[in-house]
């Protein structure tokens, strides 16, 4: 991704065409590694390939539901909102591990479509019980930004959450045991860890 202009953090029309071309021959089903969190919007391109209704579970310190800053250009901070606004197959979004402060800044009007398990909620046993008792009817796509993890568990190029790697593994185990997972992507690589 890094070598394509128009794609770092924001994805202009030409960048979108180039990236969609790069993934055209690959199905949404499977596990996809995406690079840094600056490219988390690639989840939108993967989920746009799903032809049946699905729910999206996002592990991210940031809800990624900001309105676009520039002429409806997709960004790493707006892609979840874009999916909700434009992908009719996405029936529900569950965002796990986001900052309470950032959740409060999410635009109004998405309450019926989005459920949050904030990092504060997951600090309490009741939050874990609520997460574990939930069930989604239908296919699930999982998107993980490693910035949901605490700095002891991962190094990323964004401010980070408070989940430990062990906690993320436990939450994923709940989903994998109960749900029909159709695809997974993982982002959050840090340029310093990539030696760039």
Each predicted region: which residue ranges?
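Conserved alpha-helical scaffold segments that buttress catalytic/binding sites
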Residues: 3-196
């Amino acid at each position: 991704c890094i070598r394509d202009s128009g794609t770092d953090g924001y994805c202009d029309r030409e960048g979108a065409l180039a990236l969609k071309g790069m993934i055209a021959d690959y199905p949404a089903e499977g596990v996809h590694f995406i690079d840094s969190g600056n490219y988390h919007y690639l989840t939108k391109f993967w989920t746009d390939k799903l032809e049946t209704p699905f729910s999206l579970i996002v592990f991210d310190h940031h809800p990624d539901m900001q309105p676009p800053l520039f002429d409806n250009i997709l960004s790493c901070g707006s892609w979840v909102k874009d999916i909700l606004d434009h992908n009719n197959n996405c029936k529900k979004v569950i965002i796990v591990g986001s900052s309470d402060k950032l959740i409060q800044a999410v635009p109004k009007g998405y309450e019926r479509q989005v459920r949050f398990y904030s990092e504060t909620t997951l600090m309490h046993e009741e939050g874990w019980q609520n997460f574990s008792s939930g069930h989604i009817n239908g296919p699930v796509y999982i998107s993980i930004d490693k910035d949901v993890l605490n700095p002891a568990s991962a190094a990323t190029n964004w401010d980070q959450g408070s989940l430990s790697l062990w906690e993320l593994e436990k939450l994923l185990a709940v989903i994998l045991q109960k749900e029909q997972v159709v695809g997974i992507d993982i982002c959050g690589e840090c340029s310093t860890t990539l030696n760039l």
